[in-house]
Amino acid sequence: MTTKISRRTFFVGGTALTALVVANLPRRASAQSRTINLYSSRHYNTDDALYDAFGEVNLIEASAEELIERIQSEGANSPGDILFTVDAGMLWRAEQAGLFQPVRSGKLNERIPENLRHPDGLWYGFTQRARVLYYSRDRVNPADLSTYEALADPQWRGKILVRPSSNVYNLSLTASRIAIHGEPETRRWLQGLVGNFARQPEGNDTAQIRAIAAGIGDVAIANSYYYIRLQKSTDPADQEVVEKVSLFFPNTGSGERGTHVNVSGAGVLKNAPNRDAAIAFLEYLASDDAQRYFAEGNNEYPVIPGVPIDPVLAAHGQLKGDPLNVSNLGRYQPDSARLMNEVGWQ
């Protein structure tokens, strides 16, 4: 069973309500219990059934920033067992705050590819999301698309759509370029990319896809699952967008590294009162059943090779992901923010 405490319940009302909520969570479950206290920034209701199949999950939901701050303020008395969040950059922030403890699990190390987990076992990726390109079917020949780097070419002047630089997905994409190419080359790429923006960055990933359909720009950078949601929607407006926009996997040509991938990941918190159950929960998330559920529930890519992908997503082709260890997405995040600010990506 999942007991859910939403962001609104958890944070509205200030310290008194927060203290009351935390006090109501069990500090330690019985030795035989499969009970954990899960702090999660994954805002997908489809996850609830997955948690129910594990055991008793007391779920506290908020943004990653709020949860990290909360865990820090709770200190040694925190009831939290696991932090589950989107983006390796956010996992890095929690890591830098000293919130995780290393996990030694042969099952996790065997199941989860090395590039999708922390080198020291502080956290593990459990879903993948690709940051892909979207393009206008009417105005763009897909043969003209190739790589993220090529989006800085003059032919795309006034045609590129993307979220603001503060978005962690863009910070992580830029961090991957720094890890691969170094800072000077990444700066040049960013300068060209910003010069090609169709408008000042605004909105979320779905807004970029919709802006292509509206004729505001021709090419957008956004995560893979947002378009799949539109494809599955019964809203005629969403179907109109799908008819006008297609998906493209960049950096997958001969000799290319592969498309940038990021993860949703989780780690056991330093003061976890239910450590054994927390590790069991992580191992459960790496099971074939849980991986299939992630794929079907939120249109994400499983991290376990061989687990079936959602058929609508699979219809776009096989993902060739960049093998870069995703821990680099956090390591270079401060440099990403600085460079993006310096070149005027607002």
Swiss-Prot record:
InterPro entries from the UniProt entry: Ferric-bd, SBP, TAT_signal
Localization annotation: Cellular thylakoid membrane; Periplasm
Role this protein plays: Probably part of a periplasmic ABC transporter complex futA1A2BC (TC 3.A.1.10.2) involved in Fe(3+) ion import (ferric iron). This protein and futA1 (slr1295) are subunit proteins that have redundant or overlapping substrate-binding functions. The differing subcellular locations of futA1 (predominantly thylakoid lumen) and futA2 (predominantly periplasmic) suggest they may fulfill different roles.
Induction details: Transcript levels increase when cells are grown in the absence of iron. Periplasmic levels increase when cells are grown in high NaCl or in the absence of iron.
Membrane topology: Peripheral membrane protein
Residues annotated as binding Fe cation: 43-44, 169, 225-226
Keywords: Ion transport, Iron, Iron transport, Membrane, Metal-binding, Periplasm, Signal, Thylakoid, Transport
GO MF terms held by the record: metal ion binding
The gene coding this protein: futA2
Identification of the protein by name: Iron uptake protein A2
Phenotype reported upon loss of the gene: Cells grow normally in the absence of iron; double knockouts of this gene and futA1 (slr1295) grow very poorly in the absence of iron and have a marked reduction in their ability to take up Fe(3+).
SUPFAM superfamilies per the UniProt record, alphabetical: Periplasmic binding protein-like II
GO CC terms of this entry: outer membrane-bounded periplasmic space; plasma membrane-derived thylakoid membrane
PTM note: Predicted to be exported by the Tat system. The position of the signal peptide cleavage has not been experimentally proven.
GO terms, biological process: iron ion transport
Family under the similarity heading: Belongs to the bacterial solute-binding protein 1 family.
Signal peptide: 1-31
